[in-house]
Regions:
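Binding-interface segments
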Residues: 18, 22, 26-258
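Glycine- and charge-rich intrinsically disordered segments
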Residues: 1-35, 261-289
């Protein structure tokens, strides 16, 4: 019989942000969830590793530590749920970020009240790891960035996708014109996915919309600035940034993978199942906030 571990909201709120993960109940909940979800006994080992990574992230990003204690707690448990790591070396699998979110309450003037909440953002490489582990694919090659001057041809013949590619050596341009990735399914069939210049511009526009702000003078929302990485490569998109986008785009049409309640993935996901985070708030037991 599984032991019920309760984590009280008021106890979380009384702790400094970096100390949340050192709570005995938080440790027990992380280990319990990790072992149960992944069928292993390595939860204790992973807990200590991720405590170090979590606390380092908060020390390196003091602004992140101002997020609600509840959301920081949820993010830490999502590392167990997602089976990823916060280790930032090499190709990071995920980050912890923060954003302003509505609380559901209004102030005396009738305006929405916001608070800063942390969330886990899964990178393309993190999503690739999760999909391989879920058995959706056998493996995928590293994304290939195509530059002006390279030979590149994408085709679809009788329902079969194919790519012709040859890099120009020496390279004469740093302008990025496309990217593609080769995916091998579990039945050993091959799937190619690609992004052309028009697709990259579309993603850039989405970034502008995501950063839009309300203008009190014009009484309408106005487009914001796109992520600087869309133009940081001498006006072209950053190659590493595009590789990450390429992986995420490649799985748009694939089935969903399980993620934690405090996790966001760029590729579209259907509503996920509710996961017990062991929270106790007044009369509400084991209900994620």
């Amino acid at each position: 019989m599984t032991k019920i571990i309760e984590v009280k909201v008021e106890e979380l709120n009384a702790l400094p942000a970096t100390k949340i993960v050192e709570s005995e109940n938080v440790q027990a909940k992380f280990v319990q969830m990790y072992n149960a979800i992944w069928g292993t006994d390595k939860g204790e080992q992973m807990y200590h590793k991720e405590v170090f990574n979590f606390q380092k992230l908060l020390r390196d990003n003091p602004d992140l530590a101002d997020s609600t204690k509840m959301s920081l707690y949820g993010c830490f448990l999502d590392i167990a749920v997602n089976g990823l790591t916060l280790d930032q070396t090499g190709h990071p699998l995920c980050y912890i970020l923060s954003r302003s979110s509505k609380t559901g309450h209004k102030n005396a003037q009738g305006y929405d009240i916001y608070e800063k909440r942390a969330y886990v953002s899964v990178t393309g490489y993190g999503e690739l790891t999760m999909r391989m582990r879920a058995g959706q694919i056998k493996y995928a090659d590293n994304p290939v960035v195509v530059y002006e001057g390279d030979h590149f041809k994408a085709s679809l013949v009788n329902g079969i996708k194919n790519i012709e590619y040859e890099a120009q050596c020496p390279r004469t341009s740093t302008k990025v014109i496309a990217a593609f990735i080769r995916i091998v399914r579990n039945d050993n069939s091959v799937d190619y996915q690609w992004l052309m210049e028009g697709d990259i511009e579309r993603l850039k526009h989405y970034s502008e919309k995501a950063n839009s702000k309300w203008n009190d003078q014009t009484k309408r929302r106005e487009l914001g600035k796109a992520n600087a990485l869309y133009t940081s490569n001498n006006g072209s998109i950053d190659p590493g940034f595009l590789e990450n986008k390429m992986i995420k785009h490649a799985f748009d049409a694939y089935p969903k993978v399980r993620t934690g309640k405090f996790t966001i993935m760029d590729s579209d996901q259907e509503e996920e199942e509710i996961i017990d985070y062991g929270l106790v708030d007044e009369d509400k037991v084991n209900e994620p906030v």
